[in-house]
Amino acid sequence: MDDKGNIQTNMGYRVQHNNAIGPYKGGIRFHASVNLSILKFLAFEQTFKNSLTTLPMGGGKGGSDFSPRGKSNMEVMRFVQAFMLELWRHVGPETDVPAGDIGVGGREVGFMFGMYKKLTHEFTGTFTGKGREFGGSLIRPEATGYGNIYFLMDCLLYTSD
């Protein structure tokens, strides 16, 4: 429901592609372009990206055609809570560990985690990308940048041989 009291309808999905080496792991995106076909491909791709890390993680991807752009905090929170009313029974630390993606930042992940906690009465590591107040990482905003630097340093070492 928007702030004017109008009911809004959006489609939401979670594609769990592969959990052969660990729980499903992949982002959730909120963007008008999201559809099942795109998420199936992204979940497939996420399986391979995760396997290359050598961490025990499978691949998944999710999202909705809801776009948080231009929405109030209350509109975003109401949507996320409605989304979690369906998603919560399919995620968990040993099952599926979603993260943020396009249109899903710390605020949205925090709303998801809060609703998950309310529904399950558990304070577990079910979501990555949440704020520090919910047990998130201190350097989450910089993590991708650090990863790029480490990758570049390894590339330079490899090419200098």
Model-found features: residue ranges?
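Conserved small/polar residues in nucleotide/adenosyl-binding loops
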Residues: 158-161
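N-terminal ligand-binding/catalytic initiation module
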Residues: 1-143, 147-151
